Amino acid sequence: MAEPWSGQSLQALPATVLGALGALGSEFLREWEAQDMRVTLFKLLLFWLVLSLLSIQLAWGFYGSTVTGLYHRPGLGGQNGSTPDGSTHFPSWETAANEPLKTHRE
């Protein structure tokens, strides 16, 4: 029969995870101070990400209302500029309803 989990192993789990994260962080700091090429690449990619996010935020500030206006058009239609209620009336279809359906042979 399998042994149940002991309370000590569950209590040691957060300490183990924090220890591993601490070791990873200290290794990263050593490489950061040594100006390793990977760290330089990381800095460059982090700068690119921050610059891209700031550019998106700035563009949304200028053009956000225009983009929102494309999706929410005023008019007779429902939400998001759907087909107006009055346009579903097709008189040519009503006159054709009295005629029998045509088959592909006719």
UniProtKB/Swiss-Prot annotation:
GO terms for biological process: osteoclast fusion. The gene is TCTA. Its main location: membrane. Residues 81-90 have a biased composition (Polar residues). May be required for cellular fusion during osteoclastogenesis. Pfam families: T_cell_tran_alt. The lineage of its organism: Eukaryota, Metazoa, Chordata, Craniata, Vertebrata. Residues 74-106 are annotated as: Disordered. It comes from Bos taurus. This is T-cell leukemia translocation-altered gene protein homolog. It is found in: Membrane. Residues 30-43 are cytoplasmic. InterPro entries: TCTA. Keywords: Acetylation, Membrane, Transmembrane, Transmembrane helix. The chain crosses the membrane at residues 9-29, 44-64.
